[in-house]
Amino acid sequence: MAGAKEIRSKIASIKSTQKITSAMEKVAVSKMRKAQMRMAASRPYAERIRQVIGHLANANPEYRHPFMIERPVKRAGYIVVSSDRGLCGGLNTNLFKALVKDMSANREQGVEIDLCVIGSKGATFFRIFGGNVVAAISHLGEEPSINDLIGSVKVMLDAYLDGRIDRLSVVSNKFINTMTQKPTVEQLVPLVATPDQDLKHHWDYLYEPDAKELLDGLMVRYVESQVYQAVVENNAAEQAARMIAMKNATDNAGDLIKELQLIYNKARQAAITQEISEIVGGAAAV
């Protein structure tokens, strides 16, 4: 029965792992709901300021902020939003694939790359893959604050204003629904005119106290809000991906336990049959 004992030990080990993955699934469900609430709370502001910025990009304001002026791209910057922890399926892998594809397209055109990395997984990836990381931040926790992001975002915005980079994009996972998370690369600056039907015409604004003072503050707030929204959505996507990954692990453990239980029963049945045969054979010899 040595084989049966080994199988029984494997079953016990898998059941123990199954309990852990089941508990992690339940925790991920709870965290995902909280992350969705934070995402829903911050989304109206992010979408509204994006709409206003879209109007400005289509308008002819009296003052053209540097973020509104396109120039030849010799160096591009990326703010990469990844997770701090693993066990979330292919969430980070798919994000890095989308980023590397976009970076490769830029490099083919002779464009150099600077990176601002948010999240431990992104930092680990670029240590292995290579890349010019000029700013990094991690361990933002379950409830990230925009104040934690301002320093890293400022590094990239200063680089743009100083002419060290000519385009800045944010790379993150969009939370579509519980089952779907989509890696996206979105240009932040220079501003991209919004193609909405409502913006087919030009918008004119009156600026108080003056256009320069207002736009200087508004543009920075716009970038900060978009990066913060990307972090919040990526957090929700991470918890959803982890929930699905842990559910799949729990289900797979259940299937494996059933298979091993069947093998164990067959081994036990074979051992009992052999013992009976030996007893019958011994009795016949007597």
Curated annotation (Swiss-Prot):
Cleavable signal peptide: none
Similarity comment: family membership: Belongs to the ATPase gamma chain family.
One Gene Ontology CC term in the entry: proton-transporting ATP synthase complex
Subunit structure: F-type ATPases have 2 components, CF(1) - the catalytic core - and CF(0) - the membrane proton channel. CF(1) has five subunits: alpha(3), beta(3), gamma(1), delta(1), epsilon(1). CF(0) has three main subunits: a, b and c.
Name of the protein in question: ATP synthase gamma chain
Pfam families reported in the protein's UniProt record: ATP-synt
Function according to Swiss-Prot or TrEMBL: Produces ATP from ADP in the presence of a proton gradient across the membrane. The gamma chain is believed to be important in regulating ATPase activity and the flow of protons through the CF(0) complex.
Major localization class: membrane
Localisation per UniProt entry: Cell inner membrane
InterPro entries: ATP_synth_F1_ATPase_gsu, ATP_synth_F1_gsu, ATP_synth_F1_gsu_CS
NCBIfam families (alphabetical): ATPsyn_F1gamma, PRK05621.1-1
Transmembrane segments: none
GO molecular function: ATP binding; proton-transporting ATP synthase activity, rotational mechanism
Organism expressing this protein natively: Pseudomonas putida (strain ATCC 47054 / DSM 6125 / CFBP 8728 / NCIMB 11950 / KT2440)
Record SUPFAM superfamilies: ATP synthase (F1-ATPase), gamma subunit (SSF52943)
Keywords tagged on the record: ATP synthesis, Cell inner membrane, Cell membrane, CF(1), Hydrogen ion transport, Ion transport, Membrane, Transport
Topological relation to the membrane, as annotated: Peripheral membrane protein
One record GO biological process: proton motive force-driven plasma membrane ATP synthesis
